[in-house]
């Protein structure tokens, strides 16, 4: 329960007004229920002509010292006067109408209590999803290198859905049932405190049975949600690798793997559901046992004519039965909540993940790039493995510096340090003499444009993708950017021109077309610093020519850091740096490095 209260403390404050209304309407519903069932006593007295009916000859003054006797006497007096005035039959009708009226008010209050909790339930779930999404977009790239996409998607969908179906669906029970239990229990104490105290002996025993099952349920739920993440990860990997799966005729192998994971998930869910289904029959059985015990003890009191009359005892039983239902629902919530808390733990792995790329407390705001980018004694490692070692490099404004080297030499990591996708462990990365860790992150990244090997586009129109991240761009500016990127002509050949949807990740376009749309996006942003990460790799000759032409236009008057796989694309760079095992081993122009006869020349000869 402590964990559950902590969850409510985190997410409930914005919805306090709905909570207050829910509590008020639940209290009203409980009071009306007590009063409506109290009408049963005079009805039973009239029907069965019980001893004591009509014995009250005058009203007793109100007093808290003997409140029970006052209420019993005065109610009997009014009923007696009513019988004398209109007769027993009409009195029964009037009491019945009173019962119907109070029941109508009670059901109205019940509806309002449920209606006011719905905005709270749906709002909290929305807030959790929003917090998750914002956290995902703010976390550094390093976090996602250690996490599977399918697992993250599972937490956004399956775990949030479990919180909604388990914890949020229990809010009504948890804010309604304790109020009903308190009011009904007070009524039971008022009717017969001796009989009520006797029934309390059995409550801890029943609660222990429920707790044993609930604790095991949470453990099983954590395992089930973890297996659901494995299932989603398998689906995500399959969708991303369908071409390879088909090329290697591995459909059967992947089907078997998925069936194995899916069957494990089914087994775990089955265990959770079976244990959860124990809630209703167990609470039903325990409630019946309690009623039987009270019937026996209370029946003895009635037969011996001690403390309770027959109609009052029946009213007591009605109230006891009324309290059993919220107790059963309360126990049901006790089974649901552990499942939800298991999902909250998994969600919190993202929400409470450390954001290592933090905004400086007093950021230096920079709106333009004036002089140079400098890597000063920069070293960087992933985990315990050093990827960059003592890098020293100065990139003057307006110059183009190319990075070459074999895969894993640290080229992409080096350029990722400029926009602070990662932070260095040793040394500094400076822009105009200011450490990038002192700059506002938004200001820093606004200075930089990226065109990568993987042309990442969104399921949107051409115009939506080109203007992504650029506010208030005019159509004229969009078209101009597309023309410079050699994209305008093929865009206009589509059905709706710039309003044509390009599909998931630009799937309706060729590789060269996707890359040119990315270049148009970078041109529209008009950044002073440009990072090109193997932007022409994996393209055919014609597409490469068009993309390279667009890149050369984009690079005009910009400071460019280019990672190149094909050395022919960087011959005109002002400086070429050759990286090997995390160090710059050679640097110079193309001609200088060829003349040097070292690592760069060997790479060049391999591609010739």
Predicted regions and their residues:
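Juxtamembrane helix-loop junctions of ABC transporter transmembrane domains
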Residues: 33-41, 45, 52, 98-149, ...
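ABC-type nucleotide-binding domain
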Residues: 359-360, 366-608
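Helix-loop-helix
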Residues: 187-201, 275, 279-345, 350-351
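An intracellular "coupling" helix at the cytosolic face of ABC transporter transmembrane type-1 domains
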Residues: 13-17, 141-142, 158-167, 171, ...
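Hydrophobic alpha-helical transmembrane bundles that constitute the permease/transmembrane domains
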Residues: 27-35, 100-111, 163-166, 170-185, ...
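Transmembrane helices of ABC transporter permease
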Residues: 21-28, 172-222, 296-309, 325
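Membrane-integrated ABC transporters
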Residues: 1-40, 47-99, 105, 112-117, ...
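Hydrophobic/aromatic residues within transmembrane alpha-helices of membrane transport systems
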Residues: 44, 101, 132, 136, ...
